[in-house]
Amino acid sequence: WADSVLATLSVRPKAAQMVWVWTLGDYTAVDAPQYVTIEKQIADLELGGIIVSVGGPMDIATKVNALQRASKLPLMVGADLETGAAFRARGGWFLPNAIELGGATSFPYQMGIGATRDPKLAYEMGRVTAEEGRAMGIHMAFAPVLDVNNNPKNPVISARSFGEDAKLVGEMGTALVKGIQEHGMLATGKHFPGHGDTEQNSHLELSKVNVSRARLDS
């Protein structure tokens, strides 16, 4: 199906399929400026996907479904799900009776899972993440973190990593990827080789890997 559709597209919509737009996952009125802008971008530019941020599970699913309807082609939907679907799907309150609504399963940061030394638990984390994320219409998890946390001065990786041992990171990361991908969701290993040995916060500035090739390969 994908090949047959791709063959019908000109260069511009092909390029647009590589562009994703970010959106909050919270409830948004259909005439709210933020929502109208994103809906128009998707419909007019034929964008390929959306990156969903924080919102309640029902709100995320509702917004994803609405944007899917606005798109000429099915959208890919991704989200940062490093500690499970709860990394983006938060709970809330239903009025007037103030009944607490659940969000999604929240797991420890990966260092907590790595401390168990049990790949089966990492697999189960992936399974639950995929099942809950797919229920909200999310296709791709921007997880797991596969950086090796081997620099105590690193300000941004820390507990997001499985640990400082490359073998452990590989084993636990492989299990988590399998748990995600064997249950209908795509996984994304991140961030890049050596990022666990940098000293910059990559959310704020460009991280630099100031080590030799031999250290990278070790």
Q: What residue ranges belong to the model's regions?
A:
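Enzymes and membrane/adaptor proteins characterized by extended Gly/Ser/Thr/Asp/Glu-rich
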Residues: L24-M172, H191, G196-S212
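Mature N-terminal segment immediately following signal peptide/propeptide cleavage
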Residues: W1-D26
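Alpha-helical scaffolding within the catalytic cores
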Residues: W1-L6, P33-T37, S218
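Proline-centered turn/helix-capping motifs that create local helix->coil transitions or kinks
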Residues: I180, G184-L186, G196-D197
